[in-house]
UniProtKB/Swiss-Prot annotation:
Disulfide bonds: none annotated. It comes from Lactococcus lactis subsp. cremoris (strain SK11). It is found in: Cell membrane. This is Oligopeptide-binding protein OppA. It is a lipid-anchor. It comes from the Bacteria.
Length: 600
C-alpha cells in the first residue's frame, strides 16, 4: 500500500474511495476472497465468471481539477494522481503488509528492525528492476531521502519523524553532503541498505510510520536533472520509470494514463493487456457509469451514492475510509529555513475560546445526515475508527452543535454583540473572518454557506475567500507554499491517512502540512509520547493516543469534522476486485470476464 504519506483529498464533505492506490501499489500476497464487510457493503466482488485472456480495463478518477502527474512520492501531494499511479507501482512502494498494516515478507523489499543496534535493514529483491530493465539498487532507495531532505528539490515532506535518522538533519540543513545514517553494506549498486536511527519507535513495525521511507527513485535515470527542475521534468511526470506490474505508455497531462504490462515486473504477470485511467468530472461521472463507459470510478462522493447504488451492471463495494476531514485555523507561518511552524499571527483565533466556539457552532451532524447518504458520521476525534485499538468513545469533540456553549465561550472572552449589526466586537474591532473553502462535490458551496450562516448565529462574521470557493489545486498551492498565506482564517481539509496512526507528519511543530501552523509544547509532548519507548506497551500507547485526542479537542487548533465509509461502483465483468487493505497484488490479479462491459 501507498502508506508512507498522508495525501490531500478534494472532498471535505465525505471522503471518497482511494481504491487501488493502496491495493495495487506494492502488489502483495493474494487477492482476498473472504466475505469481508464494511457497514452494509461487501469489501470484495466475487465474480462467478473467470477472467478472459487479456482485455482492457477502463477506470476513472472523479475530480474537478486536473491530475498533477508526479511519479516521485517525495515530490507529490495530489490524491488523484496517488490513486492513478497504482498500476505502475503506486509511486514505487516496496513493502508488503497484512490487513492490520504491519510489515510482512514477500514484497519488492523486506525490512528487518533491530532494537539493540537501532537500525532498519532493507533488502531489495534480486529480481527487482525498473521498467527499462535496469536494476533497482540501494542508491535508488537512498535517493528518495535526498529528494525529500535536500531543500533544492522543493519537497514538502520533511518532518520531525525523518529527523530521527542519524545525519539526515545535518544533510537537510546543508551541514553535510551525504547522509551518514544511511549506508550500503554491498555498495551503492547492491541490494541492501542499513538505516541508523537515533532511537527506535513503537510504530516502526507499521507501514506509513514516517520514520523510514517505503519507496525508491531511479537515481541513474534522474541524476543529471538539476534539483530545481526535477519536479517538472518529463522523467518524473510523463516519461517515468516504474516498478509495478504495469508501466505508463502514455501520460496526457492533467487527463489520463494509458498502462501496458511491464515486462520486467518481478511478480505475477498481469492478466490484462492494458489499463486506461482517466480523470472524469463530477458532472459527468454518473452518466459515464450509466452508459457503461468505465469498469469503476474512484473518488465518487457520498452525495452521488443514491444515483449509483442500483445501476444495472454494477456492484457497489465499500470500505472504512482510512481518512479524516477537519477544519483548520490560520495561526502563524512556516519557517522553511528552520523547518518549524511559528504561531505568531495576529488574529482572534489565537484565543482557545474563539476556536472552540466556532467549532461548536457548526451543525456537522445535520450536514452529514442531509448530504452523505449515511456514508459519513461526525468525528469525535482526529483518529478514524479503523484504528479502533487507539480510539475511545469517551473522547468528546464537536459532533453536536451547541450554540449556547459557543455564545457562552465568546461572552467569557469579552466579545460583545452589536445588536445593530448582529456581529460581535471587542476593543472596537468586529469578529470578522475569511473562510478559504474549496471546490469539492456538488454540495460544497451549499455546505460552506450553511456554516457561514451557523457562525452568524453566534455573532461571528465570516466571508468566503475572494467571495467564492477556491479551485482545489489552487487551494493546495495556497496552503502548502511556505511560509503560508496570511489572507485566510478558516479552511477545511481532508486527508487520506498513513496506516500508522501517529500524526507527527500532520501536526508536529515541524510538519509542513500543519496548515494552521500551531506550535504547542503539550501537543508536541503528546505526539512524542505516542512514539516513545514506553509506547511499546499497547495499553500505554492507547492511553497516549486518547490523551492526544482529548488535548487536540480541548485546544481546538483543528476541529474534526467527519469519519466516512468509502464506496466504489464496480462493473460486473471485473474479476478479482477487492478493497481489502491486506490485498497487495490486485493490479496483477484483476481481469475482466468479457470484452464488453456488463449492462445488467
Amino acid at each position: 500500500m501507498n502508506k508512507l504519506k498522508v495525501t490531500l483529498l478534494a472532498s471535505s464533505v465525505v471522503l471518497a474511495a482511494t481504491l487501488l492506490s493502496a491495493c495495487g501499489s506494492n502488489q502483495s500476497s493474494s487477492t482476498s476472497t473472504k466475505k469481508l464487510k464494511a457497514g452494509n457493503f461487501d469489501v470484495a466482488y466475487q465474480n462467478p465468471d473467470k477472467a478472459i485472456k487479456g482485455g482492457n480495463l477502463k477506470v476513472a478518477y472523479q475530480s474537478d481539477s486536473p491530475m498533477k502527474a508526479q511519479w516521485l512520492s517525495g515530490l507529490s501531494n495530489d490524491a488523484t494522481f496517488a490513486t492513478m499511479s497504482g498500476p505502475g507501482g503506486g509511486q514505487d512502494g516496496l513493502f508488503f503488509t497484512d490487513s492490520g498494516f504491519k510489515f510482512i515478507k514477500g514484497g519488492a523489499a523486506d525490512v528487518a528492525l533491530d532494537k539493540e543496534s537501532k537500525t532498519a535493514t532493507i533488502t531489495l529483491r534480486k529480481d527487482l528492476k525498473w521498467s527499462d530493465g535496469s536494476e533497482v539498487t540501494a542508491k535508488d532507495y537512498e535517493f528518495t531521502y535526498e529528494t525529500i531532505a535536500n531543500p533544492a528539490y522543493g519537497s514538502d515532506r520533511w518532518t520531525d519523524s525523518l529527523a530521527n535518522i542519524v545525519g539526515l538533519s545535518d544533510y537537510h540543513a546543508g551541514k553535510a553532503k551525504t547522509i551518514s545514517g544511511i549506508t550500503f553494506p554491498d555498495g551503492e549498486n547492491g541490494k541492501v541498505i542499513k538505516v541508523q536511527f537515533k532511537e527506535m519507535k513503537p510504530g516502526m513495525t507499521q507501514s506509513g510510520n514516517g520514520y523510514f521511507l517505503e519507496t525508491v527513485a531511479p537515481y541513474q535515470y534522474l541524476k543529471d536533472v538539476a534539483p530545481k527542475d526535477l519536479a517538472s521534468s518529463p522523467k518524473t511526470t510523463t516519461k517515468p520509470l516504474v516498478t509495478g506490474p504495469f508501466k505508463p505508455e502514455n501520460v496526457v497531462a492533467g487527463e489520463s494514463i494509458k498502462y501496458v504490462p511491464n515486462p520486467y515486473y518481478w511478480g505475477k504477470k498481469p492478466k490484462l493487456n492494458s489499463i486506461t485511467y482517466e480523470v472524469v468530472s463530477t458532472a459527468k461521472s454518473v452518466a459515464a457509469l450509466s452508459s457503461s463507459k468505465y469498469d469503476f470510478i474512484n473518488g465518487m462522493v457520498s452525495s452521488q451514492y443514491k444515483q449509483v447504488k442500483n445501476l444495472k451492471g454494477y456492484k457497489v463495494l465499500g470500505q472504512q475510509a482510512m481518512a479524516i476531514s477537519l477544519m483548520y485555523y490560520n495561526l502563524g507561518h512556516y519557517d522553511a529555513k528552520n523547518s518549524i511552524n511559528v504561531q505568531d499571527r495576529k488574529t482572534p483565533l489565537q484565543d482557545q475560546n474563539v476556536r472552540q466556539a466556532i467549532g461548536y457552532a457548526r451543525n456537522v451532524a445535520e450536514v452529514a445526515n442531509k448530504f452523505s447518504n449515511g456514508l459519513s458520521t461526525p468525528a469525535n476525534s482526529l483518529i478514524p475508527p479503523i484504528f479502533k485499538q487507539f480510539t475511545s468513545s469517551s473522547v468528546k469533540g464537536y459532533e453536536k452543535q451547541d450554540l449556547d456553549k459557543a455564545n457562552k465561550l465568546l461572552d467569557e472572552d469579552g466579545w460583545k454583540l452589536n445588536k445593530s449589526t448582529g456581529y460581535r466586537e471587542k476593543d472596537g474591532k468586529e469578529l470578522s473572518l475569511v473562510y478559504a473553502a474549496h471546490v469539492g462535490d456538488a454540495n460544497a458551496e451549499t455546505i460552506a454557506q450553511n456554516y457561514i450562516q451557523q457562525w452568524k448565529k453566534i455573532g461571528v462574521k465570516v466571508s468566503l475567500y475572494n467571495g467564492k470557493l477556491m479551485e482545489f489545486n489552487s487551494w493546495v498551492d495556497h496552503m502548502t507554499t511556505p511560509p503560508g498565506a496570511n489572507d485566510w482564517d478558516i479552511t477545511d481539509g481532508s486527508w487520506s491517512l498513513a496506516s500508522e496512526p501517529s500524526q507527527q507528519d500532520l501536526f508536529s511543530a515541524s510538519a509542513p502540512y500543519n496548515f494552521g501552523h500551531f506550535n504547542d509544547s503539550e501537543i508536541t509532548k503528546d505526539l512524542n509520547d505516542i512514539d516513545s519507548a514506553k509506547s511499546e506497551n499497547p495499553t500505554y500507547r492507547k492511553a497516549a493516543f486518547v490523551k492526544y485526542q482529548e488535548d487536540m479537542n480541548k485546544k481546538a487548533y483543528v476541529v474534526p469534522t467527519n469519519f466516512s465509509l468509502s464506496y466504489t461502483p464496480v462493473n460486473k465483468r471485473v474479476v478479482g476486485m477487492t478493497l481489502d487493505y491486506g490485498a497487495m497484488d490486485t493490479w496483477s490479479e484483476i481481469g475482466v470476464s468479457s470484452a464488453k462491459l456488463a449492462t445488467k
